[in-house]
A protein has these predicted regions:
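Nucleotide-activated sugar donor-binding and catalytic core shared by glycosyltransferases
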Residues: 1-244
């Protein structure tokens, strides 16, 4: 009693259905927010709050790495983010590999770099090796991953905070995600937001295309990525919108 409570990283009340703000405000005195758009949700409940920014967007440390020391193939890079959980890697990686096979029929000059956690690297290697696709690499070192991303011409990413880092690097991208159908139905009942991507949620519109559930398949990913690669104006428009 009498001790003031400051909460860093606000509960995502903008994701879940109404009512959580009223319950949470009983236990906190002040909230430090990662995103500007969150402020309106807390101010309408008269909760003291302030925007402090997201560490992913504020980190400006640069690590100089010679790209040819890491990636031996002299090809344009497309970064691929299949997720960090077992369920994500097992569900999304086969879809992404089928997407790459489709891309290889049309484009010969791309290298697909899978960004992995150290814990998932072995699992990812096993899945990719079975595909016999020879224009892929797996990177798990965080410093190298950031450098690879900066050199990428495009990114295909699972939904999550990585989209902030991709946006910060001004890399055009799309978002994919697929979960168990029962889990999807449960989430759909609980969640009130229209979009899965944090940038789309903040903007209130579809800036980064999302392929979710049944739309998350190799043909749809191929079609969407190709449409960007063949239209520089589309790429410029997306990057411009993420900077607003």
């Amino acid at each position: 009693p009498g001790i003031k409570t400051i909460h860093f990283v606000a509960p995502q009340v903008w994701v879940w259905r109404e009512g959580r703000e009223k319950k949470i405000k009983k236990f906190i005195d002040h909230i430090l927010l990662l995103f500007k758009f969150e402020k309106k949700y807390w101010e309408r409940e008269n909760v003291s709050c302030e925007f402090v920014g997201h560490p992913l967007l504020e980190n400006n440390k640069e690590v100089k790495i010679e790209l040819n020391q890491v990636i031996k193939k002299n090809k344009a890079i497309i970064s691929v983010f299949p997720g960090s959980r077992d369920s994500e890697v097992k569900k999304l990686t086969p879809i992404l590999l089928e997407f790459i096979k489709l891309m290889n029929k049309k484009y010969e000059d791309f290298l697909y770099v899978f960004h992995s956690t150290k814990a998932q690297k072995s699992n990812l290697e096993n899945i990719i090796n079975k595909s016999q696709i020879n224009n892929t690499e797996i990177i798990s070192d965080e410093r190298i991953k950031d450098h690879i991303l900066k050199k990428s011409i495009f990114a295909v990413s699972k939904s999550g905070t990585i989209s902030l880092e991709i946006s910060k690097r001004k890399i055009p991208s799309i978002i994919i995600y697929k979960m168990n159908f029962i889990n999807f139905l449960i989430v759909k009942m609980l969640v009130k937001i229209k979009y899965a991507n944090i940038l789309n949620i903040a903007a209130g519109q579809m800036i980064i295309p999302e392929l979710l559930q049944s739309k998350c398949n190799s043909k749809q990913i191929y079609k969407l990525v190709s449409s960007f690669l063949e239209d520089q104006n589309k790429i410029k428009k997306q990057i411009s919108n993420t900077e607003k």
